[in-house]
Design a protein with these regions (language model features):
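Walker A (P-loop) phosphate-binding loop of P-loop NTPases
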Residues: 13
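Phosphate-binding P-loop
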Residues: 1-3
């Protein structure tokens, strides 16, 4: 039996984490196995990328293209290491952000062509969708 992948999208402070925690508790109370994750993050590489982008001086002033590719690298690892295996095992994966955030933050806000963002995202996620 395949699992389920649910993503929560929205701006900072809109309640994504609160809703994820509530749904996770409800699903677990129903006997479901739930994996909670976030982007960037969820793997050692993802957490490193998160730290680089948010806290490291090397992440300051990064070009939009470099930022997009770091998110894509993190996502590729995340899908292959955590998300796809959990779904294959019948687990429910709840993710704080995924593709839509990249489309908005790197595509729209950083003015990268949406077709390029989509192509890179699709390459990163492979057959997950």
């Amino acid at each position: 039996m395949n699992g389920l992948f649910i993503t929560f999208e929205g701006g900072e402070g809109c309640g994504k984490s609160t809703q994820i925690a509530a749904l996770k508790a409800r699903l677990e109370a129903m006997g479901k196995t739930v994996v909670q994750t976030r982007e960037p993050g969820g793997t050692a590489l993802g957490e490193y990328v998160r730290s680089l982008l948010q806290h490291d001086d090397a992440g300051q002033g990064m070009s939009p293209e470099a930022e997009l590719l770091l998110f894509a690298a993190s996502r590729a690892q995340h899908v292959r290491e955590l998300i796809a295996p959990a779904i294959a095992q019948g687990q429910i994966v709840l993710s704080d952000r995924f593709l839509d955030s990249t489309t908005v933050y790197q595509g729209v806000a950083r003015a990268i062509d949406s077709k390029k963002v989509d192509t890179i995202n699709q390459f990163a996620i492979g057959d997950i969708n």
